[in-house]
């Protein structure tokens, strides 16, 4: 790796002083993440105007408390748009509080699942108890990651460490998400939980998370639908005895790496997805233009289906950039397609001129690249110095099947 940190095992349990476990029984699951000591926390949430009760409750808790000890999350029900949903959200936290012996004011919560269905609190309370019993026996990051899965095909977890003198700082995370992914979380259905043993103020952590989320989670698109429950939390407990101000650049880069890897895992697990799309937009006149254009590429349903079918229909890329609203000159821009895995690449369009035409070597190479599972599309608008990278996935038959049967 180019960065000065190392990939390690353990996810949210890798940093000092954190434990986690979870339990899932068919539809419902519960994850508990706890710190041995008081921690500061930052959170980012969905900007959907229809938002879940745990989002409201966690925003309230973050505002009113300075220190935190635990995160609890459930899968199986979004607890959104339901009568008595806020009471259920509070009861969920209260149950965890009684078991963990941690004040309710120090517990943050999140939910994921079907919208508009009443929480089965009897089942959920049993799952909280089972998750707690599992946590008493052992700390298990894999179980914690599994318990929050819904339509996810695989667990999403990552951790890194870096040195500051003789001391070590660790950051770890878990996430869930496969469909309904197009977060726009101000400075996630997508849930992300990150832990670190850095010593940092609440305001510093908030700024670092906002910057990381803008470049990672907020650049991830599976289907263009924004969830009511998107949430990312970072807990920092200071157990490394390293202060953030000793390693600002290193920590921010490591947090961005964790966030980006989790975001890429989420889009790679898009319901029925087989391919990761990385859209790199450079040469834009403004940062806003760069993001609009790169997001337009990964949002395009026509492009997603072309990627699924390994069809190098570069016109769909050009069209997506063209309607994004970014400043461009159709007679002077580049489109390059490459394999992230093999490094093979070819121009499709260069300086506004089509190269990948019928019978050309460029088209043949593009067809070969499109068969890979990790594809990078690079567009150079030649209008300035701004750049942005967005992440998406292909869209195929399985996505329709999963979502047509979701509540049945």
UniProtKB/Swiss-Prot annotation:
Catalytic-site annotation from UniProt: 189
Location of this chain's protein in the cell: Cytoplasm
GO biological process terms, semicolon-separated: L-arginine biosynthetic process; ornithine biosynthetic process
Signal peptide: none
GO molecular function, one term: L-glutamate N-acetyltransferase activity
Pathway: Amino-acid biosynthesis; L-arginine biosynthesis; L-ornithine and N-acetyl-L-glutamate from L-glutamate and N(2)-acetyl-L-ornithine (cyclic): step 1/1
Catalytic reactions of this protein: N(2)-acetyl-L-ornithine + L-glutamate = N-acetyl-L-glutamate + L-ornithine
Positions bound to substrate: 150, 176, 189, 271, 403, 408
Pfam families: ArgJ (PF01960)
Site (Involved in the stabilization of negative charge on the oxyanion by the formation of the oxyanion hole): 112-113
Cleavage, annotated site positions: 188-189
Assembly and oligomerization: Heterotetramer of two alpha and two beta chains.
Identification of the protein by name: Glutamate N-acetyltransferase
């Amino acid at each position: 790796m180019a960065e000065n940190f190392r990939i390690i095992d353990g996810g949210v349990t890798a940093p000092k002083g954190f434990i986690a476990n979870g339990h899932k029984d068919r539809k419902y699951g519960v994850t508990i993440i706890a710190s041995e000591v008081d921690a500061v926390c930052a959170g980012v949430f969905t900007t959907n105007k229809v938002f879940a009760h745990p989002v409201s409750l966690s925003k309230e808790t973050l505002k009113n408390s300075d220190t935190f000890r635990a995160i609890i999350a459930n899968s199986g029900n979004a607890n959104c748009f339901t009568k008595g949903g806020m009471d259920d959200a509070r009861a969920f936290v209260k149950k965890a509080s009684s078991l963990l012996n941690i004040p309710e004011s120090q517990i943050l919560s999140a939910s994921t699942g079907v919208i508009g269905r009443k929480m089965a609190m009897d089942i959920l309370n049993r799952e909280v108890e089972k998750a707690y019993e599992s946590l008493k026996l052992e700390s298990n990051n894999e179980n914690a990651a599994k318990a929050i899965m819904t339509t996810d095909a695989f667990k999403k977890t990552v951790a890194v460490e870096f040195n500051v003198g003789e001391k070590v700082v660790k950051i770890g995370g878990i996430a869930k998400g496969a469909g309904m992914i197009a977060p726009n979380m101000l400075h996630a259905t997508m849930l992300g939980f990150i832990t670190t043993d850095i010593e940092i103020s609440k305001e510093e952590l908030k700024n670092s998370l906002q910057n990381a989320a803008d470049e990672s989670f907020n650049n991830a698109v599976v289907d263009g639908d924004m969830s009511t429950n998107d949430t990312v939390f970072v807990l920092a407990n200071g157990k490394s005895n390293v202060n953030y101000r000793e390693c600002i650049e290193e920590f921010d880069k490591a947090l961005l790496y964790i966030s980006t890897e989790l975001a890429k895992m989420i889009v790679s697990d898009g319901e029925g997805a087989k391919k990761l799309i990385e859209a790199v937009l450079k040469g834009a006149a403004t940062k806003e233009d760069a993001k609009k254009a790169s997001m337009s590429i990964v949002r395009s349903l026509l492009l997603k289906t072309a990627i699924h079918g390994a069809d190098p229909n570069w016109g769909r890329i050009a069209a997506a950039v063209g309607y994004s609203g970014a400043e461009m000159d159709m007679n002077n821009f580049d489109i390059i397609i490459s394999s992230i895995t093999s490094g093979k690449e070819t121009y499709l369009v260069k300086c506004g001129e089509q190269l990948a035409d019928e019978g050309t070597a460029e088209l043949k190479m593009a067809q070969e690249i499109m068969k890979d599972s990790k594809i990078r599309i690079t567009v150079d608008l030649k209008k300035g110095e701004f750049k942005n990278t967005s992440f998406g996935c292909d869209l195929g038959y399985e996505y329709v099947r999963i979502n047509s049967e979701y509540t049945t």
